[in-house]
Structures are given as structure tokens and as C-alpha cells.
């Protein structure tokens, strides 16, 4: 059925059960990932952006109500990021995009504590999330082009998304959002599809 969600198992068996509950609603994930593509990312509801740490490609949000902190890594946007995609394809993290993301991640963990942070990323941002953090992670439609498994990761993907076809080999917890075939490949890759989870607690 269109929009149905499906939880997959993997070869790791019991290890998949060790993946922690993330403590974040899917609607919040959708909006924060979408906002990461804005030219000037801004606050979202109770999530206030930490301007002292945030940049254009990675943002740090603090929820003063819950105490939760979100670090969001943006996906591909522009020719420069396409070059980064190509570098990641060969397992090369020696680039300014990665260095800046790692710096922001380290500063956020030093300021707020790693246990209080959920790191999220869409597409290329998901790959970066895997590489800069070993804490709680939520990745969405992340292309898996090298070994980037993490037992603390919730990997969400949309069926028929051409950019994350081989992410089924990932460890951790998985959610697949069932989606019909679309002639526009970017439709199934879009963060809009997360809305089909109906504000599920992740």
C-alpha cells in the first residue's frame, strides 16, 4: 500500500534490538531536515538554533523544553557538494565539508554532552552523520557507498529511492517507507516522504 511503513530485520539479529529509541517525532525530523537546506536555517518550534555553533551545512538545535539537542547535517545542494559526494564514493573524507561538519559536531558534544544529542542527516548528510558521530543517529535515504554501519543508528529509507538502494546492508534499526515508482527520482528521495510516518515517535 502506498505510504505504508515496514520495519526490516537484518543479519545482525539481536544486535539490531540494541539500537536505542531516539526520542524524536518523525514530523520534527522531517521539518529539521528540510530546514537544513534553507539558505539561512532558522528556529523550528521549540527547537532554537544555536547560532554560535551552526553553519550553512550543519546546524545545532536546542529544545529548552525537553533539553534535547539536534545536530542536522545537510545533504547535497550544489556543485561543490557533488564533488564531496564523489570523494565519499571512494571513501575519502579529506575535504573541507567533512572537516567543518566534524568541528561543529565536536563542539556541540563538548557543549551539550554526546548523550543529549541526536545527530540527523539526509542523503549526503546521512553519510556525514555516520562519520562524525558514534552517538544516536537518524539517517534518511542515505546512500551506502562504504562501510558506515552504526548500531546506534536508525536508518529510514523510502522504497524505490534510487540513491539509497543498497542501504539494506546497514546495521542498526531500519524503517522503510513504502512508496510507488515515480518517474521523477527526486520525488522518492525527498524529505516530504517522512510525513507518511504520521508523526511516529522514533
What residue ranges belong to the model's regions?
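Serine hydrolase/lipase
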Residues: 5, 11, 15, 65-68, ...
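A conserved cap/lid and substrate-binding interface adjacent to the catalytic center
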Residues: 15-16, 21-118, 136, 148-152, ...
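Active-site-proximal beta-strand/loop segments in catalytic clefts of secreted hydrolases
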Residues: 73-76, 122-123, 140-143, 159
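Short amphipathic alpha-helical segments and helix-helix/interface helices
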Residues: 105, 129-130
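Gly/Ala-rich beta-loop-alpha elbow adjacent to hydrolase catalytic centers
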Residues: 120-125, 129
Amino acid at each position: 500500500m502506498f505510504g505504508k511503513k515496514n520495519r526490516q530485520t537484518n543479519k545482525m539479529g539481536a544486535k539490531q534490538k540494541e539500537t536505542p529509541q531516539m526520542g524524536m517525532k518523525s514530523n520534527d525530523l522531517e521539518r529539521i531536515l528540510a530546514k537544513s537546506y534553507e539558505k539561512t536555517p532558522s528556529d523550528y518550534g521549540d527547537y532554537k538554533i544555536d547560532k554560535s555553533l551552526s553553519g550553512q551545512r550543519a546546524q545545532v538545535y536546542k529544545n529548552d523544553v525537553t533539553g534535547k539537542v539536534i545536530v542536522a547535517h545537510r545533504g547535497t545542494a550544489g556543485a561543490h557538494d557533488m564533488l564531496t559526494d564523489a570523494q565519499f564514493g571512494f571513501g575519502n573524507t579529506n575535504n573541507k565539508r567533512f572537516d567543518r561538519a566534524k568541528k561543529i559536531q565536536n563542539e556541540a558534544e563538548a557543549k551539550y554532552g554526546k548523550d543529549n544529542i541526536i545527530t540527523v542527516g539526509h542523503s549526503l548528510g546521512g553519510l556525514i552523520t555516520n562519520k562524525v558521530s558514534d552517538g544516536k543517529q537518524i539517517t534518511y535515504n542515505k546512500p551506502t557507498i562504504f562501510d558506515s554501519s552504526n548500531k546506534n543508528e536508525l536508518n529510514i529509507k523510502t522504497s524505490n529511492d534510487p540513491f539509497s538502494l543498497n542501504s539494506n546492508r546497514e546495521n542498526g534499526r531500519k524503517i522503510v517507507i513504502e512508496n510507488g515508482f515515480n518517474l521523477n527520482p527526486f520525488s522518492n528521495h525527498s524529505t516530504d516522504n517522512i510525513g507518511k510516518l504520521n508523526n511516529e515517535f522514533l
